[in-house]
């Protein structure tokens, strides 16, 4: 309908304005386009995978890693078996593609204790710190002998 077309046009103007503001501010990373996310998953997961968040979850993790954010907490809601399969199932593939990635799935369900969740996050942060220190050592200028 005419009203729907007008709303789509207005929405696209708003999206472009937000993307421009984010680009100019240098404080935020502008999210990739839908088309770019579709290209990222080629050969990793099928576009037909529409369970849970489907291929988009994997694509967003790949986007984060390629944008310089290799430390990812993948929160899994209780009772969402498709998201659980796609989220956890793709982590090994992503770690093979991006060896320096640090992805940890955290299950949020009544059976998981808060302490267990916090410990898994702390472990992920410890690995992130260790990786950062290792990268600093590798990039440090070598002392002359």
Question: Language-model segments: what does each one mean?
Answer:
Residues 8, 80, 138:
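Functionally engaged cysteine thiol sites
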Residues 142-145:
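Iron-sulfur (Fe-S) cluster-binding modules
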Residues 131-139:
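Transmembrane alpha-helical segments and their short flanking loops
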Residues 34-132:
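Hydrophobic alpha/beta core scaffold segments
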Residues 10-51:
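Active-site cores of enzymes that catalyze phosphoryl transfer or operate on phosphate-rich substrates
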Residues 1-9:
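Single conserved hydrophobic/aromatic residue that forms the stacking wall/gate
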């Amino acid at each position: 309908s005419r009203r729907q077309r007008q709303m789509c046009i207005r929405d696209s103007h708003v999206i472009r304005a937000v993307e421009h503001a984010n680009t100019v501010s240098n404080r935020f990373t502008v999210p990739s386009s839908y088309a770019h996310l579709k290209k990222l998953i080629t050969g990793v997961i099928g576009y037909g995978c529409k369970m849970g968040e489907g291929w988009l979850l994997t694509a967003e993790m790949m986007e984060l890693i390629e944008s310089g954010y290799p430390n990812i907490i993948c929160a899994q809601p209780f009772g969402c078996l498709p998201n659980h399969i796609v989220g956890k199932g793709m982590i090994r593939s992503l770690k093979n593609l991006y060896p320096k990635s640090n992805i940890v799935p955290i299950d949020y369900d009544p059976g998981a204790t808060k302490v267990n969740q916090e410990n898994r996050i702390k472990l992920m942060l410890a690995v992130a710190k260790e990786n950062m220190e290792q990268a600093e050592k590798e990039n440090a200028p070598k002392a002359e002998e």
